[in-house]
Amino acid sequence: MSQLQSLRGMVDLLPEQTRRWQAVEAVARDHFRRAGVEEIRTPLLEVTELFARGIGEGTDVVGKEMYSFLDRGERSCTLRPEGTASVVRAAMQHGLLNQGAQKLWYAGPMFRYERPQAGRQRQFHQIGVECLGVSSARSDVEAIALAWDLLAALGVQGLELEINSLGTPEDRQCYRAELVAWLEARRDQLDADSQQRLTTNPLRILDSKNKATQALLADAPTLLEALSPESAQRFAQVQALLHQLGIPFKLNTRLVRGLDYYGHTAFEITSDQLGAQATVCGGGRYDGLVEQLGGPATPAIGWALGMERLLLVLEAAAKADPAGAAAQLTMSAPPEVYVVNRGEAAEAVALSLTRSLRLAGVAVELDGSGAAFGKQFKRADRSGAPWAAVIGDEEAASGVVCLKPLLREGGDQRLPLSDPAAIVTILHSAPKSSLESEEER
């Protein structure tokens, strides 16, 4: 019988990787707590219409990449391909929009049927922030600063912020007509995908990865040139506030977000840790989405970062600077004590001691192999624990445990098993030298 494997693009997270993810999530959780951003959790499965209406029928996400199916009630359901639409749906459904401005964050898996590659899988994970009910240029910059400062706190180096303004729907409509006319005159120079997008979603051509198309677009009209005076003034405010906060940025007039609901400020944050500028975070303003989904007109801005790409960047940062924040983040904390035990009576006593110490708040790793003491001590050394708690049948019969220091010179200490508080005190102290231990005897 053949061995079962995970689906292509659906990757297991093993314990070492999971520790890194938990460390990133812990930093993010604390970062958001200090900013007054509250966590929200939404279902993985939503009605397909949510994304068709929210993301846009003409997008690649809806047209080519969603995992959709009919359930037993003949309802079309979709595994969420992104987090924003679900958060907005939840805020509408539960009346959060009636309670004033909302700052929400989420973390979890998303699903898109794409070609798997490093840092980009079919099941991928995001950490995202959605600020609902805020309309000012200042709120745009606060959202950008939240993302920028989180990445800096995680130890990501070589950060670069790119910004653009997508203006209002009216601005984009005027620009769309101008861009289409310009591109139609050069249709034969476009790649096949861009030729198709010319009629379905022409703004997405600006984001083409085709080098020939990108070279052609160097002379194309820009959206910034089509902004109304009000939109241009708003974007100038965003830039001024970024300068005020000392967050460096550059204008990218070709920057468009991949989803239809974006308008006004759009941004991406990249890092050069992987050798080339790789996008680790993207977002923007989406004032029309709530109304598009059947709710009241509600201004909003948000962003998301991809965990898989971020972890690759952090691993590169840790290698480049072994003493830096990224390296510290990816290190796992060792147990405080490793319990070495052998013998039928000893194993039962060791289990009781382990539980008592854990209940007292001590991080304990119990060796359950039953191997010879020599092999267990090798594992104890590899664990990084500063102490080994040794229990053989002799110690079990005498009702004692032998505490042996592993990371520095020091004498063994024998303590009664009936006094776990004394054992905890020793474990939380520096090991004593052999001479000190002999004097106490």
Curated annotation (Swiss-Prot):
Its EC number is 6.1.1.21. It catalyses: tRNA(His) + L-histidine + ATP = L-histidyl-tRNA(His) + AMP + diphosphate + H(+). It comes from the Bacteria. It is found in: Cytoplasm. InterPro entries: aa-tRNA-synth_II, aa-tRNA-synth_II/BPL/LPL, Anticodon-bd, Anticodon-bd_dom_sf, His-tRNA-ligase, HisRS-like_core, HisRS/HisZ, HisRS_anticodon. Signal peptide: none annotated. One of its GO terms (biological process) is histidyl-tRNA aminoacylation. One of its GO terms (molecular function) is ATP binding. GO terms for cellular component: cytoplasm. Coiled coil: none annotated. Its main location: cytoplasm. Keywords: Aminoacyl-tRNA synthetase, ATP-binding, Cytoplasm, Ligase, Nucleotide-binding, Protein biosynthesis. Homodimer. PANTHER family: HISTIDINE--TRNA LIGASE, MITOCHONDRIAL-RELATED, HISTIDYL-TRNA SYNTHETASE. Belongs to the class-II aminoacyl-tRNA synthetase family. This is Histidine--tRNA ligase. The gene is hisS.
